[in-house]
Swiss-Prot record:
InterPro entries: DNA_pol3_alpha_NTPase_dom, DNA_pol3_finger, DNA_PolC-like_N_II, DNA_PolC-type_N_I, DnaE2/DnaE/PolC, DNAPol_HHH, DnaQ, Exonuclease_RNaseT/DNA_pol3
Reaction(s) catalysed by this chain's protein: DNA(n) + a 2'-deoxyribonucleoside 5'-triphosphate = DNA(n+1) + diphosphate
GO cellular component, one term: cytoplasm
NCBIfam families in the cross-refs: dnaq (TIGR00573), polC_Gram_pos (TIGR01405), PRK00448.1 (NF001688)
Keywords: Cytoplasm, DNA replication, DNA-directed DNA polymerase, Exonuclease, Hydrolase, Nuclease, Nucleotidyltransferase, Transferase
Source organism (scientific name): Streptococcus pneumoniae serotype 2 (strain D39 / NCTC 7466)
EC category name: transferase
Main localization of the protein described in the UniProt heading: cytoplasm
Protein name: DNA polymerase III PolC-type
Family that this chain belongs to: Belongs to the DNA polymerase type-C family. PolC subfamily.
Molecular function as annotated in GO: 3'-5' exonuclease activity; DNA binding; DNA-directed DNA polymerase activity
Gene Ontology terms describing biological process: DNA-templated DNA replication
């Protein structure tokens, strides 16, 4: 202690024992700074160590008290020569840091002072809730905290927050508990105030006051059912004592460590949505709030506050009650309710919302006797609709809204023989006020009379429509009121134009519109309709230039350099069209030899002109079973042969398959509606003759046409509907009022809006109206499922009698003509293979005799007999034989095939070669004399674990096998369950195996199993946020979640099962079961798929799972490298089993490879999760490995179940429940009847143990207890949600052990195969740079993973580097890429070194790698330029190669390559 410091201690009166403390022995005052103006003395002390907190506080107190006596203030800073400290000392000083200075701010102090801290080097970790981890604190407060600790003598810290979920929850809980107390106190204060007011008031004249506290409390808090309800959308800030009413759409309960329960739920009133919170004391009290459940309607009261954790407004609920919500009902009497004939399900791609089950249930609830489904272009809702209708007891009418096209759209109308080069043409164009020749007006007719390409006369007249032109018309055409105000009368213009056109060929672009408009006006003025030839240059161009994507007038004139100054003014359009005509005439003569007008339709129209034809909608319905097959054929043809952008049905194709079908005229996109609007009733009558009934829809459905200015107003719309009715009446065809349903409830409209708008402005439905910032898509129609009374209201303008006829009478009458149909068959229809039963039996016994001798041991004979009885008796032999043929073919190509699923439970499958898993009891068998010995007492879980033994008969070493798996787990207890045989082919051989299926059964009977992809929850969330952005909306989080839920589940695309192939029996055809299509509408795909999701028909047809897997590919690669037959690798190799207990067998330590066992890169056991299980359980036998495999794949089998039992010492790895089959086997060994043991296994494996009735469950428990099954086993059963089949586990473990064998005994082969086949990401620079670089890169990625900053590629790379590190530690190396030795895709062994392939280089794909290898076989690369050219490499890749030293001294160019470039 220095003299100056000792003097200071005396002056401060510090206790003697403290002055003598070791901490102050070498104390010194470094300097003192006196601030005279502020009267602050600043001491700088130096101590040997950081002071104990008690001495520090005493020193601080002494200085403060002594200097305050003279009106001064003393502060001090400390330097410690040694900065060693304990976390306990740090914690003490951490709290002290908040006592004064900048850290003493109340907000910072209240959140941080009581938290736990720890130091690691210069990092100070503060453990706290999510609320404290804010940018504000990091930026403004944590640096001050570091400075304050530095003044106490600590090193300079970098302060970081370490989030703790438990603290987050506790802080939230404490906040709400305190908040509830404040609210309660406020209510009680209000009550006391009311009581005081009442006491001050004069008493009633005849009655004494009664003070009832509960009554006053009720008065202060109005009853919830009488409280005023606030719409959620009106609440944008914090408010107290609000009442909401709405439906719950999400609910979750959390139990805190203290036992309190937080009920989080979300509600919507369809104006917006809100998050709610309700805290209750414990789980028992939480049961009182079971009314908070999904889809329940509640009225809630509470305070709306900003939640500090979600950063969104949240209601803290004080009280709530269930309310009765009014549901829409069909109010018409029974027998007077409608039938909906036009309803879309969520299978209408990106267009409609309800599942077919919802439509059926709604119709049934409303008492409708039938309902029809009409999805766009597909029938994928049929199977689910079929089952739903049977369940609901309602008639379902099966339909489709199809896209009908004309097969051949004419180029020439009214054609005659005429030399194209000698004809005189009138090329004309009209401008109108709209698209309807009936409801809109001609405002300009212009034409150019042309001969041999020259204009010889012109016609151009405006016409006054008799009303001001709309802004839309003027904007589109450039024609103003001034243009037309002094124009000639329409009739005069028409007469003059007819005279102008005499003896000519008329020409127009999209002539059907112009000719239709002119004919309608001619007819209206009693003038003859057009009869001379008409050329449509739109169709002329489409057939002459099919390769062009666009054939509009604008794109064509631009392409051919024809001037078009004012598009949409008739005179300019006409002349431009004429110039194009003569280009086409010249082209068609030169390229196609067509010179005669009459030959254009014959010689030029393409067979696939339907691809460009205008689509018209029609509804097609299945009348009977013949119709069902025909609609399947139509859907198939439209989605395969005639698919172009969308599914299309050419009219002639529809005609050929029309038997058993009923046709409706569909919506505003149908041709009847179109012709009624554009050409009038007479023309529409001719078109409507094709249909069986006419559809009319509510005006609200057609209303978007008004917004698009295609229809003038609602009055005109009603006139169009009346015209449609007239069409039906004139033809004697029924007219039906249909609803074009796209969702069930009116409030669901927003979900469809979000889905449709997500398609973007390129979609026709989203084409904008208006311009610039005012451009918006037309509104969508109100397309909810309407009740009868709602439909009658929509058609009230027709009068009650007519409305009832359309809505009720006609729909019910038409429903009567539809017959019941069988959409999904009730039986399994397996394909036919000649002598399948005999072959399966023959193959089975042949192999069994070969292994077990003849006669067979009883246990083998009985098992075969039992299985064959089920297999052959239920028609499953063909399934077994087909699988056997596929496996045999792959084996012959040199690949092993692994089984998956429970097929290994079948001994017949083992004998005929479908699976290598032997399901018999553990047993020995002699390969020399067929002696066998079976162990049936359960003492061994696997035959591979039995000790080695020699044959007592011949002394030959016995082989060991048998996994003890009952057959019942494959085909059910009665052996009649359809077998699901899944096979793992090598990924390399899978395409060949698929083609084998076609070869065996025929191309017309084998199809890939189809799938339907719907909008996922995350995608729907993206759609909502996109809608928010694009349409200027703002939704709180709860509303976004609600909207995303509503938008999810809509069909988005189709696909195919990765390996599933559906086989149709050759005595039927595919249309007996399903239509077909291409996956994702890819008409270039090699395979067609089932149109139905394969799950919908999997009980009717055979599905073969021909899957691709890496394991067989690995085994094949290892066999090729080593020459070792994988079938001869033992399953009980000591070295292999040693991998599961340590790393010694690899010659490395756990520290070297970062894991305590040798599991890295071993299939099934190499993941972090399973490696952790291995570390905990230390398996030593094959049976225990099976257990691990089952435990790792099951749900709630390991975590919270077997893991706890093993940790607590109640059971071990061999006795816990691992695989589903173990339950049946264990219970039978315990003494239960096989049937009951099987049933218990089925209940447990499907997670049904706690869902079955208490009576049933108790029966099983009593039986188990009676047979001394331990209590822990029974409890374990109750926790399981899903279990893995033992046969699947056995097949996977056998493959894994083969791979592991090479890792132990032939490591260089193993690493070569692993990196060639399994590794997903490479960093060849790091991989070849040695251990230090590898470990450093792993550490970098590991750090990123901790902070959730690692990319998927980096995560994959980390897995690769783990194996790379292990390989280097074992003494092997990676070489550099070698331009002349590296392979395209596979690693190359060079002694103890692996040379990487070209695909391991970042950015170099497989195709380029193969091209590079082919190029080098042609000769050496003489320059980088040649390498780029011949090798197909980009400049960037060549530069990378050069940087990596792969190219050596290769020059940039050479004389030869320069010569090649020049010539």
């Amino acid at each position: 202690m220095s003299n100056s410091f000792e003097i200071l201690m005396n002056q401060l009166g510090m206790p003697a024992e403290m002055r003598q403390a070791p901490a102050l022995a070498q104390a010194n005052i470094e300097r003192v700074v006196v601030h005279k103006i502020s009267k602050v003395w600043e001491f700088h002390f130096v101590f040997s160590n950081i002071l104990p907190i008690e001495i520090f506080l005493e020193l601080k107190k002494g200085l403060s008290e002594e200097f305050s006596k003279t009106g001064n203030k003393a502060v001090f800073e400390i330097k410690a020569r040694s900065q060693e400290f304990s976390n306990q000392l740090l914690q003490s000083y951490y709290r002290e840091a908040f006592s004064e200075g900048p850290c003493a701010s109340q907000g910072f102090k209240s959140l941080y002072q009581n938290l736990q801290v720890r130091a690691e080097g210069n990092q100070l970790f503060i453990e706290g809730s999510e609320a404290i981890d804010k940018e504000h604190f990091k930026k403004n407060h944590l640096p001050n905290l570091a400075k304050q600790l530095e003044k106490f003598g600590f090193p300079t810290f970098n302060c970081q927050v370490e989030k703790n979920d438990v603290l987050t929850q506790e802080q939230e809980e404490a906040f709400h508990a305190e908040n509830e107390q404040i609210v309660q106190a406020a209510n009680e204060e209000a009550l006391r105030a009311m009581e005081q007011l009442e006491q001050m008031a004069p008493p009633p004249a005849e009655e004494k006051p009664v003070f009832d506290f509960q009554a006053k409390k009720a008065a202060a808090k109005p009853k919830l059912d009488k409280a005023e309800i606030t719409p959620m959308i009106e609440v944008t800030t914090e408010e107290n004592r609000l009442v909401f009413e709405g439906v719950v759409f999400d609910v979750e309960q959390k139990v805190t460590r203290t036992g309190r329960v937080l009920i989080n739920f979300k509600m919507t009133d369809y104006t917006s949505s809100f998050s709610m919170q309700k805290w209750v004391k414990n789980e028992e009290e939480a049961q009182k709030f079971d009314l908070i459940k999904k889809n329940s309607w509640l009225r809630v009261r509470g305070n709306v506050e900003m939640n500090n954790f979600t950063r969104d407004l949240t209601m803290n609920v004080q009280d709530l009650q269930e309310v009765v919500h009014y549901e829409r009902k069909d109010l018409m009497p029974e027998g007077e309710r409608r039938v909906e004939f036009h309803a879309h399900t969520n299978m209408s791609t990106m267009d409609a919302l309800p599942e077919v089950e919802e439509i059926v249930a709604t119709a049934a609830k409303w008492g409708h006797k039938a309902v029809a489904i009409t999805d766009h272009g597909n029938v994928q809702s049929f199977p689910h609709g079929y089952k739903a209708a049977k369940k609901a007891g309602i008639q379902l009418i099966y339909g489709i809204e199809a896209n009908i096209v004309e097969d051949r759209v004419p180029i020439v109308y009214n054609e005659v023989e005429m030399d194209l080069s000698e004809a005189t043409y009138v090329v004309f164009d009209v401008e109108t006020t709209g698209l309807s020749a009936i409801y809109n007006d001609l405002i300009q007719v212009a034409a150019s009379k042309m001969y041999k390409g020259n204009v010889i006369a012109e016609f151009d007249e405006f016409i006054n429509p008799g009303h001001p032109l709309s802004a839309f018309t003027t904007e589109l055409t450039g024609i103003t009121d001034d243009h037309v105000k002094n124009a000639k009368p329409l009739e005069q213009v028409l007469q003059e134009f007819q005279e102008f056109c005499k003896d000519t060929v008329l020409v127009a672009h999209n002539a059907t519109f112009d000719v239709g408009f002119m004919n309608a006006n001619y007819e209206r003025h009693d003038l003859p309709k057009i009869s001379q030839p008409v050329i449509d240059t739109l169709e002329f161009a489409r057939n002459l230039y099919p390769e062009y994507k666009r054939h509009g007038l604008g794109p064509l004139t631009k392409r051919f350099g024809v001037a078009l100054e004012h598009h949409h003014m008739a005179n300019y359009d006409a002349e431009a069209t004429g110039r194009l005509l003569f280009i086409f005439i010249k082209e068609v003569a030169e390229k196609h030899g067509v010179t005669d007008l009459a030959r254009l339709n014959i010689d030029l129209i393409s067979p696939d002109s339907y691809k460009k034809a205008r689509i018209k909608h029609a509804t097609i319905y299945v009348k009977n079973q013949v119709g069902l097959k025909n609609i399947f054929k139509l859907v198939s043809l439209s989605n395969t042969k005639y698919f172009e952008g969308v599914s299309r049905i050419p009219r002639t194709v529809l005609d050929a398959h029309r038997e058993g079908l009923i046709l409706g005229s569909a919506c505003s996109e149908g041709e009847v509606f179109d012709v009624v609007v554009s050409q009038g009733v007479d023309a529409a009558v001719e078109v409507a003759k094709y249909y069986d009934f006419i559809e009319v829809m509510p005006p609200a459905i057609y209303a978007p046409l008004i917004a698009k200015e295609q229809v003038k107003d609602m009055e005109e719309l009603q006139t169009i509907i009346k015209s449609l009715i007239e069409v039906g009446d004139r033809l004697g065809k029924p007219v039906l009022a249909t609803g074009n349903v796209h969702y069930i409830e009116p409030e669901e409209e927003i979900y469809r809006e979000i889905i449709v708008r997500s398609l973007g402005q390129g979609a026709m439905i989203n084409r904008t109206i208006g311009h610039g910032e005012h451009a918006q898509p037309a509104p969508l129609p109100k397309a909810h499922f309407r009740t009868t009374n709602e439909m009658l209201d929509e058609f009230a303008f027709l009068g009650e009698e007519l409305a009832r006829k359309l809505v009720i009478e006609n729909t019910n009458a038409l429903a009567e003509i539809f017959e019941p149909v069988e959409v999904v068959k009730g039986d399994l229809y397996t394909p036919f293979i000649d002598k399948a039963e005999e072959t399966v039996a023959e193959l089975t016994y042949k192999k069994a005799f070969e292994i077990y001798g003849n006669p067979l041991p009883d246990i083998v004979d009985l098992r075969i007999e039992k299985e064959l009885t089920s297999i052959l008796g239920n028609g499953f032999a063909v399934i077994y034989l087909a699988s056997q043929m596929l496996v045999q073919r792959s084996n012959e190509r040199g690949y092993l095939v692994g089984s998956r699923g429970s097929v290994g439970s079948s001994f017949v499958a083992t004998m005929i070669g479908i699976t290598e898993v032997n399901p018999l009891s553990p047993h020995y068998v002699c390969g020399q004399c067929q002696y066998s010995e079976f162990i049936t007492d359960g003492s061994y879980g696997s035959g591979f674990d039995m000790p080695h033994k020699d044959c007592p008969n011949c002394g030959h070493k016995l082989s060991k096998n048998g996994q003890d798996i009952p057959f019942e787990t494959f085909l059910g207890f009665d052996g009649d369950k359809v077998p699901d045989i899944d096979l793992n082919f090598s990924g390399e051989d899978q395409p060949s195996a698929h083609l084998d299926v076609r070869d065996i059964f025929g191309e017309e009977y084998a199809f890939r199993a189809g799938t339907v992809g719907t909008v996922a929850a995350k995608t729907a969330y993206g759609f909502v946020k996109g809608y928010e952005r694009d349409y200027g909306k703002f939704y709180r989080d709860a509303e976004v979640e609600r909207l995303a839920q509503g938008a999810a589940g809509v069909k988005r695309t189709t696909g195919q099962h990765p390996g599933g192939i559906v086989v149709i029996p050759n005595y039927m055809d595919v249309y007996d079961f399903t239509p077909v299509q291409y996956p994702a509408d890819d008409v270039t795909a090699e395979w067609q798929t089932t149109h139905f999701n394969f799950h919908d028909i999997d009980e009717n047809v055979l599905k073969l799972d021909v899957l691709g897997h890496d394991d067989p590919t690995m085994i094949r690669k290892l066999q090729d490298l080593s020459g070792i037959d994988p079938n001869k690798i033992p399953m009980d190799d000591e070295g292999v089993m040693a991998l599961f207990s340590g790393t010694d067998v690899l010659g490395v330590t756990p520290e070297q490879i970062g894991t305590p066992t040798g599991m890295l890169g071993i299939p099934e056991f190499g993941t972090n999760f399973v490696r952790g299980m291995v570390d905990e359980t230390h398996p030593t036998t094959f049976a225990e490995l099976l257990q691990l495999s089952g435990l790792s794949h099951g749900t709630d089998v390991w975590l919270g179940n077997a893991q706890d039992l093993i940790k607590q010492g109640i059971a071990d790895l061999s006795t816990v429940i691992g695989c589903r089959d173990d339950i049946m086997v264990y219970l039978m060994h315990a003494g239960l009847e096989p049937k009951m043991a099987f049933t218990i296994m089925e209940r447990v494996r499907k997670g049904l143990w706690l869902k079955i009735s208490e009576e049933e469950r108790n029966g099983y428990i009593e039986a188990m207890k009676a047979n001394k099954v331990p209590e822990w086993y029974i409890e374990s059963c109750g926790k399981i949600k899903y279990m893995f089949p033992k046969a699947h586990a056995a097949a996977y473990v056998m493959m894994a052990l083969r791979v592991a064998y090479f890792k132990v005994h032939h490591p260089i082969y193993y690493y070569c195969a692993y990196f060639s086949i399994r590794a997903k990401a490479f960093d060849i620079k790091t991989m070849g740079a040695g251990l230090e670089a590898i470990k450093r890169r792993m550490e970098e990625i590991s750090e990123k993973r901790k902070n959730n900053e690692a990319s998927n590629v980096e995560i994959d790379l980390y897995t690769t580097l783990e194996i790379v590190n292990e390989m280097w530690e074992r003494g092997f190396k990676f070489g550099k890429l070698d331009l002349y030795r590296s392979q395209a895709t596979e690693f190359l062994i060079d002694g103890d070194t692996l040379i990487p392939p070209f695909v391991a280089m970042d950015g170099l794909g497989e195709n380029v790698a193969k091209q590079l290898v082919r190029a080098r076989e042609e000769g050496e690369f003489l320059s980088k330029t040649e390498l780029r050219k011949r090798g197909g490499l980009s400049s960037t890749l060549v530069e990378k190669m050069d940087e990596m030293g792969i190219l050596g001294n290769m020059p940039e160019d050479n004389q030869l390559s320069l010569f090649d470039e020049l010539f």
